[in-house]
């Protein structure tokens, strides 16, 4: 049931009636990041119920923020794409993210660690440039996490396609990364660096594999600085 509006003519109030309902802003984050299919959107908001996700998408469609389209090449599959109106919200979402990055207490943000969301965020922001000349596999392990969500595999293909697996894909692993979830989340957010957390992170692989991981995931100095200002893919 939709909450009553603010009943003010102010544009901030009117926009807030749509954008500030529960889950809407993080759903927009996923849409702006490039997710268009229902299951991919769910991976970005794993704690959001499918029913509520469908409802929020319908509300955004009714407001002209997203447009539902048939997927090319997949009969019976539909996708939700941002309209021009929706694309204009990129700067709004990025501004909120940048403010949160600078102003929200680090200890508070690290209370909400989630391995599935962390790895999904890594997968969509991983930039394999230049792409490898052969398939490259990086396995991440979080020993303190229960078994079903303990290990993840990032698979980078020679043409640049990136896949995330939560079950062993059966490929040869080029680099093993083992650390606790809180540490990796802090590194990924740019709150600390791989060098500063060296005692907590175990890397097992060739120097070339380590170099690729650092470059692709932005674990170098430039990547850390970039993450201090929130940007979506």
Regions picked out by a protein language model, each given a short descriptive name:
Residues 7, 18, 68:
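Internal alpha/beta domain cores that form substrate/cofactor-binding pockets in large enzymes
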Residues 10-48:
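N-terminal helix-turn-helix DNA-binding core of bacterial DNA-binding proteins
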Residues 1-8:
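N-terminal intrinsically disordered/low-complexity leader segments
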Residues 1, 28, 36, 41, ...:
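Short, intrinsically disordered low-complexity segments
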Residues 24, 68-69:
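A local structural micro-motif
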Residues 9-10, 178:
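A generic alpha-helix surface/boundary motif
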Residues 47, 52-67, 73-90, 94-233:
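Feature captures hydrophobic
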